[in-house]
């Protein structure tokens, strides 16, 4: 759900701005001075939309557009080729995304029906997880602040949107000046909560130049977004090298935040500044290892621990085992915070259950799957496996020099409530959050700049793709099809198809995000 406070602030803020604008424009005393002030500052206000335009940057744009003309010519030629390829590729990408979304909807529908008909929980879980992974693999996803975009990351999101938009429009502006089109100004706007940028070009000049020149201008925006995304990927890859004088990597993951409701909180839990090196027997050297280890723990059976027969006899006590609702076995007091029910096979291969103090049972022991794994170290040892609910795991988290944390719960809860980084500061005065901030922002910049390039390339009404398509058809079909009406009709149907495809993706994407 979108936070109510966010909606109240946005609607209340825009209402206040619009009413103030309306009152000042209706005032006998302030009307002329206020309108003059708006005009002099290049401001215009309408419901849920503020626009600012200036000619202050015109000299800079003209300087960029006239510098190294030959190099810019080649640069925008590359951009033109990329733009045309991207325009046609966007059809395939949107079609693939639409098929994936429909597949996800069908998977969710079958999962709901199987749940209502009392299917086995394991099969339902696998169906749900596979459909979720299918949705997460999509190249394009609808983003709604407060639903699938955390509120605490809105700053990254909107900053990346604004920078991507500015770079996009700078591309259009420089290309236009390079093609001798008059540049009137540059501006920034705010629509509801989304920021953006624009350039004001002299339309008559734009219509007089050749279709190929128009293509260079119209493709320049998405070309610059593509290059920005590539630079972001390069920066992300080189980030460990860039930060090497101040931060090192490859020895574990550093805890940067533990949520207040995290199961990892406690006297023997995780704390900010702890360095995690292992999850069970899975070594952790970076964030990717952490995620892969948690995935392995989630989807593989619970691992066991070797315990000697003498220790088992000493720690265990008579218990009464019973079945849980999910079919697993419990043999400890439900309210116990230290004891866990373990299962094992004795020398006669009979499965038994015993309630043991978890820390004493698993501390300083090797992991195992069967008794054979334990016979290597001692002939009189057993492999005891925690008997937990279907999706619950006992995870031993190593974070030296502190004592190992024993986590009992769903691995995903650990994943979502504990924030980590691969970067460890070399000096105490350095912030552990700085690499996380830089890394997160660069990832948003890559995603949003790339998305802006893809979406704007779609031959859809009111997007760059419309003008790219029109110029492309003018450049290629004018000599083939003499009748302009036929050419325009072809363009119209392509635009209609692209618009329907994009609208379907957005509508179904919104439904998937808000209705799940």
Curated annotation (Swiss-Prot):
PROSITE patterns assigned: ZINC_PROTEASE
Glycosylation sites: 334
GO biological-process terms attached to the record: bone maturation; cholesterol metabolic process; membrane protein intracellular domain proteolysis; mitotic G2 DNA damage checkpoint signaling; positive regulation of cholesterol biosynthetic process; positive regulation of transcription by RNA polymerase II; protein maturation; regulation of response to endoplasmic reticulum stress
Pfam families on file: Peptidase_M50
Residue spans crossing the bilayer: 4-24, 75-95, 96-107, 142-166, 171-183, 184-206, 226-248, 444-461, 462-473, 490-510
Membrane topology: Multi-pass membrane protein
Family membership noted in the UniProt record: Belongs to the peptidase M50A family.
Name of this chain's protein: Membrane-bound transcription factor site-2 protease
Biological source species: Bos taurus (Bovine)
Gene for this chain: MBTPS2
């Amino acid at each position: 759900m979108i936070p109510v406070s966010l909606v109240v602030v946005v609607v209340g803020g825009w209402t206040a701005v619009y009413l103030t604008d309306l009152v000042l424009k209706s005032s006998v005393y302030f009307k002329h001075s206020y309108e003059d002030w708006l005009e002099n500052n290049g401001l215009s206000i309408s419901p849920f939309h503020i626009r600012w335009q200036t000619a202050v940057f015109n000299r800079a744009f003209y300087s960029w557009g006239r510098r190294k003309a030959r190099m810019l010519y080649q640069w925008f030629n590359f951009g033109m080729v990329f733009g045309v390829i991207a325009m046609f590729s966007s059809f395939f990408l949107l079609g693939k995304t639409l098929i994936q979304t429909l597949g996800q909807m069908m998977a969710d529908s079958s999962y709901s029906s199987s749940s209502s008909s009392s299917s086995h929980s394991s099969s339902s879980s696998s169906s749900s997880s596979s459909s979720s992974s299918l949705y997460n693999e999509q190249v394009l996803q609808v983003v709604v602040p407060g639903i699938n975009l955390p509120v605490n990351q809105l700053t990254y999101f909107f900053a990346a949107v604004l920078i991507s938009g500015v770079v996009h429009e700078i591309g259009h502006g420089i290309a236009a000046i390079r093609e001798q089109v008059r540049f009137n100004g540059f501006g920034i706007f705010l629509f509801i909560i989304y920021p953006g940028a624009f350039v004001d070009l002299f339309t008559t000049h734009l219509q007089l130049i050749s279709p190929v020149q128009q293509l260079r201008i119209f493709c320049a925006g998405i070309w610059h977004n593509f290059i920005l995304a590539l630079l972001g990927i390069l920066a992300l890859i080189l980030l460990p090298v860039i930060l090497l004088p101040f931060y090192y990597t490859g020895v574990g993951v550093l805890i940067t935040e533990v949520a207040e409701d995290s199961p990892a909180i406690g006297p023997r839990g995780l704390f900010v500044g702890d360095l995690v090196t292992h999850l069970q027997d899975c070594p952790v050297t970076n964030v990717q290892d952490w995620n892969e280890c948690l995935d392995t723990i989630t989807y593989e059976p619970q691992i066991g621990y070797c315990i000697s027969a003498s220790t088992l006899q000493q720690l265990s006590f008579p218990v009464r085992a019973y079945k849980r609702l999910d079919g697993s076995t419990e043999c400890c007091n439900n309210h116990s915070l230290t004891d866990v029910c373990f299962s094992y096979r004795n020398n006669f291969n009979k499965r038994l259950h015993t309630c043991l103090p978890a820390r004493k049972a698993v501390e300083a022991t090797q992991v195992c799957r069967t008794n054979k794994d334990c016979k290597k170290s001692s002939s009189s040892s057993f492999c005891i496996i925690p008997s937990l609910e279907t999706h619950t795991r006992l995870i031993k988290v190593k974070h030296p020099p502190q004592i190992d944390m024993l986590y009992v719960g769903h691995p995903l809860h650990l994943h979502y409530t504990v924030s980590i980084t691969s970067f460890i500061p070399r000096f105490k005065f350095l912030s552990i959050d700085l690499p996380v901030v830089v890394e997160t922002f660069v990832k948003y910049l890559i995603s949003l700049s790339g998305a802006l390039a893809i979406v704007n390339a779609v031959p859809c009404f009111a997007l760059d793709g419309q003008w790219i398509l029109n110029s492309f058809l003018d450049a290629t079909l004018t000599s083939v099809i003499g009748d302009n009406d036929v050419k325009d009709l072809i363009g119209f149907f392509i635009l209609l198809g692209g618009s329907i495809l994009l609208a379907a993706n957005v509508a179904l994407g919104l439904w998937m995000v808000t209705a799940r």
